[in-house]
Amino acid sequence: MTQAVMLQGTASDVGKSVLVAGLCRIFYQDGLRTAPFKSQNMALNSGITPDGKEMGRAQIFQAEAAGITPDVRMNPVLLKPTSDRQAQVVLMGKVATNMDAVSYHDYKPRLREQILAVYNSLAQEYDVIVLEGAGSPAEINLRDRDIVNMGMAEMAQCPVILVADIDRGGVFAAIYGTLALLHKQERDRVKGVIINKFRGDVALLYSGIEQIESLTGVPVLGVMPWLDVDLEDEDGVALQNDKYRGNAPRDITIAIVQLPHISNFTDFNALAAQPDVRIRYIRRPEALTDADLVILPGSKNTLSDLAWLRESGMADAVLQTHRQGVPVMGICGGYQMLGDTIVDEVESGLGTQPGLGLLNTITRFAQDKTTTQVNATMSGELPGWLAAAAGLPVRGYEIHMGETVLQEGCCTAMTLQKNGCSVADGAVTADGLAFGTYLHGLFDSDAFTRAVVNGLRARKGLAPWETTFCYAEHKARQFDLLAEAMRQHIDIDKIYTIMQQHQEPV
């Protein structure tokens, strides 16, 4: 008999993903085999499972919180927006097609049977499934074909807890309005409310909580304070909310260009956790002035974002910063942009386009997507700020549709081990001031990260830090801190009771 509970939100970015991770950690600490599940995730932050399947980063870090290996069944449908109207549809970890919103809405009913089968297969292996909704269940225009909120709760026959964000204001209206827009059978499935991201004296909420409970008949299970925990965000909404502006003074400042279609910005969480590093996401040319390193991150639409770089003045600013001796790094789409030429006869149909010209490379887009976890070794000789990283082992994952070929003047940055073969990856110039790679997650390799940060310190005349920061241990501490706070501020016993009362045979 598998127990399950689903967290749905009054809106996007109310904190569902983090609270799901917290519940996964709590149940894991309590000795229960626990798995996260989100039937459909729309995000540009994705990762790769050990068997080469692509899934949302949120479910990956939730699986880590539960102490298990990420499994693509935890996120069977992943939507990766390529424009305001189109998205790449990834089914069970592999690209299926590209669709516009209307076409996908019509397509969703065909996914129900597959989603339910995947969910049931997980339920047969775990004691508890913690499900996550998307956006709000009160999107009445999407209700008839819903597969991720109440539609999924109905398929799983599980109770729902509604999460509301008080930090954005209007929390009681959001709770009341959401419940009012649900059908009665949907409303009956909601067994509790969590008020999230509260700052101040909780006593000020008591009268409001009593009234909302009286009005809705749904109990408030807890009020979570605004937590200073360092955990991954699901999508770019967090970048818009100033979480990553990085105003605290640190020895090293790293500027990451916030591309319109930025993907996998979780690549930089380990960098941001370094005690001597300040990360800043920037969209204005003048914000580059104090950067010790500039990074062009991954992109879901490389040529569109390259055009934005030029139109916004960011391209000129990056090139000027490079001429002043500041290193520039590119990851995946950012690596492609740093090259001389990009040939796209697949994604945009724009043909051959010039890159920024900092690396003498040619990239050709391809139909097939590379998705794999890899171990790699940095090249034995690396110049400049990268020198201390020479020969170091690193680990990461590839998600890209294209191949990049080095021309004269570029050296290979690292060697990947793939299917028993050694494969060259990345490019670096002779002076080390331009460096690119397809490898996501590179900075999760602690020794590499400390080596390159110390290389940046040396450029400023600062002594190296001898202690290597362990990012895996840091993440584990954050999961434990989250679980501790949730036990303190949420009635976890009540959640256990809710799950037991609605326990269903699989």
From Swiss-Prot:
Location of the GATase cobBQ-type domain: 251-448
Catalytic residues, chain numbering: C332 (nucleophile), H440
Keywords assigned: Cobalamin biosynthesis, Glutamine amidotransferase
Protein's pathway: Cofactor biosynthesis; adenosylcobalamin biosynthesis; adenosylcobalamin from cob(II)yrinate a,c-diamide: step 3/7
Molecular functions (GO terms): ABC-type vitamin B12 transporter activity; catalytic activity
GO biological process: cobalamin biosynthetic process
Domain of life: Bacteria
Transmembrane segments: none
Keyword rRNA-binding carried by entry: no
DNA repair in keyword set: no
Subunit-level organization: Homodimer.
Annotated HAMAP family: CobQ
Similarity comment: Belongs to the CobB/CobQ family. CobQ subfamily.
PANTHER family the record matches: COBYRIC ACID SYNTHASE, DETHIOBIOTIN SYNTHETASE
Physiological role: Catalyzes amidations at positions B, D, E, and G on adenosylcobyrinic A,C-diamide. NH(2) groups are provided by glutamine, and one molecule of ATP is hydrogenolyzed for each amidation.
Protein name per UniProt: Cobyric acid synthase
Gene name, Swiss-Prot/TrEMBL: cobQ
